[in-house]
Regions:
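Extended intrinsically disordered or low-complexity regions, especially N/C-terminal cytosolic tails and loops
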Residues: 1-214, 226-245
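Acidic/aromatic/glycine-rich contiguous surface patches that form carbohydrate-binding/processing clefts
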Residues: 222
C-alpha cells in the first residue's frame, strides 16, 4: 500500500500527471483508487481521458459531485411520488392494505396469459421470485431493527403494503409494478395523466421506474455519473416517444 506522497510521485512518474506539492489533501479527498482511477476514463476503461494535471481530475470530480447534488432530490422525489401513486392504485384495486390480499387480488399480471403457455409460466415465476425478494427485504430490515417493519412483526400484525414499499429497492418496486394487473397499471397511468394513446396498457410507469433506477442508485451510492456509466439497460422507445411529444 502506497502512502499519499508515494501516490503523488506515482502519478507524476507513471501517469505523467502534474501534481502540486500542496495537493496531498485534495488527492486524499477524491481518493486515488476510487477517485482518480474512476475518473480517468469515460464509460469504459479503454476510453481514457488524457489528464495532464491533478487540477483537471479535481475539476471533473467537482463537476460530478455538483451533478449529484442537483439530481439527488429530484430522483428521490420521483421515487417517492411513483410509490405513492402505485399504492393508491393498489389499494383501490385490492380494497386492502394487507400484503397477502394485495398479492392475491392485484399482483396477477400472469393471469392475462393462457394457462400453461410460455408467458404464463414466465410471469408466474416472476411473481413468485418477487414474493421471495419482498420476504428477504422485510427480513433484512427486521434484522436491522427498522421500525416500520419491527412495529408490525413484533406485535404479530400483518404488514401493510405501504410499509413493504419502504423496504423495497427501486428495482424490486419495478418488478412489483410489472407483476400488477391491468387495473393497477391503468389507474396509475390515470393518476399520472399519461396520454391513453401512448399508454393503453399502462406500462409506461414501469418504463419510468426502470429508466430512473440506475441513476437513482448511482447518485444514492455516490458513484460516478457524469458519463452515464451506471446505465445497465436502454430506455424503452415508448417512453422516449412520450418525452418527445
Amino acid at each position: 500500500m502506497l502512502s499519499i506522497n508515494q501516490l503523488m510521485k506515482y502519478l507524476r512518474n507513471h501517469h505523467q500527471i502534474s501534481v502540486k506539492s500542496n495537493q496531498a489533501q485534495s488527492l486524499r479527498n477524491i481518493g486515488y483508487y476510487h477517485g482518480y482511477k474512476g475518473y480517468r476514463f469515460i464509460r469504459t476503461p479503454n476510453q481514457r481521458i488524457p489528464f495532464s494535471s491533478l487540477d483537471e481530475v479535481i475539476a471533473l470530480n467537482k463537476f460530478d459531485m455538483q451533478l449529484k447534488t442537483l439530481i439527488y432530490p429530484k430522483v428521490m422525489f420521483i421515487e417517492n411520488a411513483l410509490k405513492s401513486y402505485v399504492i393508491e392504485a393498489v389499494l383501490q384495486d385490492s380494497k386492502s392494505e394487507n400484503l397477502d390480499v394485495v398479492f392475491n387480488k392485484s399482483i396477477t399480471a400472469y393471469q392475462s396469459y393462457a394457462p400453461g403457455s410460455q408467458q404464463y409460466h414466465k410471469q408466474y415465476a416472476k411473481r413468485m421470485t418477487l414474493k421471495g425478494k419482498i420476504n428477504n427485504a422485510l427480513l433484512r430490515d427486521y434484522s436491522n431493527q427498522k421500525q416500520t417493519v419491527n412495529h408490525f412483526f413484533d406485535t404479530d400484525r400483518p404488514i401493510p403494503i405501504w410499509a413493504v414499499f419502504e423496504s423495497l429497492t427501486l428495482g424490486e418496486f419495478g418488478t412489483f409494478f410489472a407483476c400488477a394487473n391491468a387495473n393497477v397499471k391503468l389507474k396509475t397511468s390515470s393518476i399520472l395523466h399519461l396520454p391513453s394513446n401512448l399508454d393503453s396498457d399502462g406500462k409506461i410507469t414501469e418504463y419510468m421506474i426502470y429508466a430512473v433506477k440506475d441513476l437513482r442508485n448511482a447518485v444514492a451510492h455516490n458513484n460516478t455519473i457524469f458519463d452515464t456509466r451506471f446505465q445497465t439497460s436502454t430506455i424503452n422507445k415508448r417512453l422516449i416517444s412520450l418525452l418527445e411529444t
